[in-house]
Amino acid sequence: MTLSHSALQFWTHLYLWCLLLVPAVLTQQGSHTHAEDRLFKHLFGGYNRWARPVPNTSDVVIVRFGLSIAQLIDVDEKNQMMTTNVWLKQEWNDYKLRWDPAEFGNVTSLRVPSEMIWIPDIVLYNNADGEFAVTHMTKAHLFFTGTVHWVPPAIYKSSCSIDVTFFPFDQQNCKMKFGSWTYDKAKIDLEQMERTVDLKDYWESGEWAIINATGTYNSKKYDCCAEIYPDVTYYFVIRRLPLFYTINLIIPCLLISCLTVLVFYLPSECGEKITLCISVLLSLTVFLLLITEIIPSTSLVIPLIGEYLLFTMIFVTLSIVITVFVLNVHHRSPSTHNMPNWVRVALLGRVPRWLMMNRPLPPMELHGSPDLKLSPSYHWLETNMDAGEREETEEEEEEEDENICVCAGLPDSSMGVLYGHGGLHLRAMEPETKTPSQASEILLSPQIQKALEGVHYIADRLRSEDADSSVKEDWKYVAMVVDRIFLWLFIIVCFLGTIGLFLPPFLAGMI
């Protein structure tokens, strides 16, 4: 019974407290809402949003201006535009929007639609596309002192002069110029909130990095008007991140340039030197077409990568011309060209030593011919036969001499015809001391004379072919030496061209 009475007392007291507190809270909230309603009526009852918020016409509205960048969306090199997502921080004082917080339930600030109050007509002067002014009219923050704080977001496309000299290792200087479009400095003046762009809320770009972003205050007199107009100009120094272009453009271009060097190491006999040159030239043409789609169409400067591609295309074109010349030299013969002495001395003697080229000696000069050699008189052909075979053949010859017809008018020297298991063999006979009567009695048959003439013809033909082959080999070696000269020359030029590609942006501090 006691517990029930205590519980009843507790719930009774709780109910009484609720009856006392809830109306008080509701009354306070209602009075606060009522205070804001009264404040709105007080402020905007006779408010004119088209008049400047100054007590006197000669007074100047001071607008404090600042810029906060949220994102660097894009830099269009071809159309020379920079697209940014920014917040325009603006602050000014409107004397018609002041109140005493004590009279309005201690309300110190209000959020009011920006369409209801006077706002400065600050626009982007160097706008390239889209709206010059802010399109999304957010609410303004109004304080009891009359201070209005307005931070509308905007996406601007500002014109930017793109310098592609060191593309893709380039650094661009873009600007955004803000100012009042209709009010001159006597009506509205600007002050900078900060000397730099606010990067606290900046979202990093995957292609560009903001190196520096500062603002300056300027006053300028334009040709259209006699008044002076103030502006705040923000200068952005942005640097391209070159990894994408290095992997997809520069490295393939360098590799293709190296293929040009291999053209001079490719043997002329393979018949693919011209094909390789043309393939490299077509590949470079494709890369040049890709670059023309990226960089702006300007005749002021040529981008560094464009210069390198143009240099490589000239490089490849020269390699085609040189390859045609080398192939022409390679296929020369004694019947078409005579080798000048200076070519023989320079390209067969001195230059190969400078290039560390060692030409192997031909087998004839190393070991001599194992099967065939000429007699000192160049009239007889002697084979390398065994002494036993010669003696047997001489005995057979003596037996057959009885059946040989005798003719007159033979030469002074004698000749032996040897028949062995290897076929017909001729050898030079040692001159013997014979009397005139014996010399006049040595006769040969017409068949043997014809055979000897055929052997002489074959020997002369072989000597001529050996001489022609030697000259052809000399021309081929000259072509090889010319190839080696341009191989080293093109390696040096390719190396210097690559250094020339990376050195200027490196010295400029862009790499």
Swiss-Prot record:
What the protein does comes down to:
Component of neuronal acetylcholine receptors (nAChRs) that function as pentameric, ligand-gated cation channels with high calcium permeability among other activities. nAChRs are excitatory neurotrasnmitter receptors formed by a collection of nAChR subunits known to mediate synaptic transmission in the nervous system and the neuromuscular junction. Each nAchR subunit confers differential attributes to channel properties, including activation, deactivation and desensitization kinetics, pH sensitivity, cation permeability, and binding to allosteric modulators.
Signal peptide bounds: 1-27
Query: What's the name of its gene?
Result: Chrna2
GO cellular component entries: acetylcholine-gated channel complex; cation channel complex; cell periphery; intercellular bridge; neuron projection; neuron projection cytoplasm; neurotransmitter receptor complex; nucleoplasm
Molecular functions (GO terms): acetylcholine receptor activity; acetylcholine-gated monoatomic cation-selective channel activity; heterocyclic compound binding; quaternary ammonium group binding
Q: Which residues lie on this side of the membrane: Cytoplasmic?
A: 330-484
Bridged cysteine pairs (disulfide): 160-174, 224-225
> What stretches pass through the bilayer?
242-266, 274-292, 308-329, 485-503
Disulfide bond: is it a keyword of this entry? yes
Give membrane topology per the record.
Multi-pass membrane protein
Name the chemical reaction catalysed here.
Ca(2+)(in) = Ca(2+)(out); K(+)(in) = K(+)(out); Na(+)(in) = Na(+)(out)
Q: Which UniProt keywords apply?
A: Cell membrane, Disulfide bond, Glycoprotein, Ion channel, Ion transport, Ligand-gated ion channel, Membrane, Receptor, Signal, Synapse, Transmembrane, Transmembrane helix, Transport
**Chain ranges on the Extracellular side, renumbered to this chain:** 28-241
Q: Which residues are glycosylated?
A: 56, 106, 212
Instruction: List localization entries.
Output: Synaptic cell membrane; Cell membrane
Q: Quaternary structure per UniProt?
A: Neuronal AChR seems to be composed of two different types of subunits: alpha and non-alpha (beta). CHRNA2/Alpha-2 subunit can be combined to CHRNB2/beta-2 or CHRNB4/beta-4 to give rise to functional receptors. The alpha-2:beta-2 nAChR complex is proposed to be a heteropentamer with two subtypes: LS (low agonist sensitivity) with a (alpha-2)3:(beta-2)2 and HS (high agonist sensitivity) with a (alpha-2)2:(beta-2)3 stoichiometry; the subtypes differ in their subunit binding interfaces which are involved in ligand binding.
Family statement: Belongs to the ligand-gated ion channel (TC 1.A.9) family. Acetylcholine receptor (TC 1.A.9.1) subfamily. Alpha-2/CHRNA2 sub-subfamily.
**By what name is this protein known?**
Neuronal acetylcholine receptor subunit alpha-2
Q: Name one GO biological process term.
A: response to acetylcholine
